[in-house]
Amino acid sequence: MSRIVLASNNAKKLVELRRTFEGADTEVEIVGLSEVSDAPAPEETGRTFVENALIKARAAAHETGLPALADDSGLEVDALNRMPGIRSARWSGPHAHDERNLQLLLDQTFDLPDERRHGRFVCAMAFVDPDGTEITKVATMEGRIISEARGKNGFGYDPMFVPDAQPGDLTSAEMTPEVKDAISHRGQAVRAIVPAVVAHLEGR
């Protein structure tokens, strides 16, 4: 069985990524970064989601000697020039956390009319093998920003984002994990990268 390290110390993201990857029925053991390394997280200096995902995956592969899978995700709001974008996790400042980021999103969008509330979640997945192989995939989940937080599931901006790809009007934070995984940017990106990763590992 092959082992892959997930380059994330975000517990909720780790659970979501592991659940989605393992749901693909592959002979791969997923280990969290903190289980195999105490190295500090690399500085995310990239200008795109893909660049930042590669920075994290390369660092994890280098530190652990294991193939590494990393994601860089964020919210783009069209009316805010696609902000917060790659700064989604740190948007509200050096001590940013979900509640502060949500409040900032509310402050920035409270007076937007419905027709200007479109946005999307973006996820870039990067796989890096110490042998030099690199694979990347990008996926999005389109939707709209609402004017209040709803729901307790998920994390980040989920409580204020209503995905288009659903029959109802639930926020990402009101969906069950199974429903969210089926349509989410991260679920799509993981499902896109899994076949390429498995093919690479089987061909080593």
Curated annotation (Swiss-Prot):
One of its GO terms (molecular function) is ribonucleoside triphosphate phosphatase activity. Pfam families: Ham1p_like. It catalyses: XTP + H2O = XMP + diphosphate + H(+); dITP + H2O = dIMP + diphosphate + H(+); ITP + H2O = IMP + diphosphate + H(+). Mg(2+) binds at E43, D72. Binds 1 Mg(2+) ion per subunit. Its cofactor is Mg(2+). Keywords: Hydrolase, Magnesium, Metal-binding, Nucleotide metabolism, Nucleotide-binding. Its EC number is 3.6.1.66. Substrate binds at S8, N9, N10, A11, K12, K13, S73, F155, G156, Y157, D158, K180, H185, R186. The active site is at D72 (proton acceptor). One of its GO terms (cellular component) is cytosol. The keyword Protease does not apply. InterPro entries: dITP/XTP_pyrophosphatase (IPR020922), ITPase-like_fam (IPR029001), RdgB/HAM1 (IPR002637). GO terms for biological process: nucleotide metabolic process; purine nucleoside triphosphate catabolic process. The keyword Protein biosynthesis does not apply. Belongs to the HAM1 NTPase family. Pyrophosphatase that catalyzes the hydrolysis of nucleoside triphosphates to their monophosphate derivatives, with a high preference for the non-canonical purine nucleotides XTP (xanthosine triphosphate), dITP (deoxyinosine triphosphate) and ITP. Seems to function as a house-cleaning enzyme that removes non-canonical purine nucleotides from the nucleotide pool, thus preventing their incorporation into DNA/RNA and avoiding chromosomal lesions. Homodimer. NCBIfam families: RdgB/HAM1 family non-canonical purine NTP pyrophosphatase (TIGR00042). This is dITP/XTP pyrophosphatase. It comes from Cutibacterium acnes (strain DSM 16379 / KPA171202) (Propionibacterium acnes).
